[in-house]
Amino acid sequence: MTLFSSISSMSTSMSGSKSSISSFGSGTGMGSNSIACGGGCGGSGGILGSGLGLGLGLGLDLTGGSRSRGACGGNGGNRGNGNGGMGGGNGSCCGGPCCGI
């Protein structure tokens, strides 16, 4: 398993039924595609909530349904809101030229 080595900071914020986990450039995850789509390009929208992905790249995916988001945008994973910094709609950056993979 390949991990991206970088400084990561995680913060969990609970508000009603929403939970967002932010991670800067972390490619660690347990999802099916979280490593390939992780790091600066992001992974999924997190476990439960929206995960903003403001150019930071959300690389944590524990749901197994990761889609590229964060800096490259894309889908938000299983239940995320795909609010990536550069937009996108269906995870087209996952494994694509946008992420350089």
Swiss-Prot record:
GO terms for biological process: sorocarp development. InterPro entries: HssA/B-like_chaperone, HssA/B-related. It comes from the Eukaryota. Residues 1-26 are annotated as: Disordered. It holds the Pfam family Coiled. Belongs to the hssA/B family. This is HssA/B-like protein 40. It comes from Dictyostelium discoideum (Social amoeba).
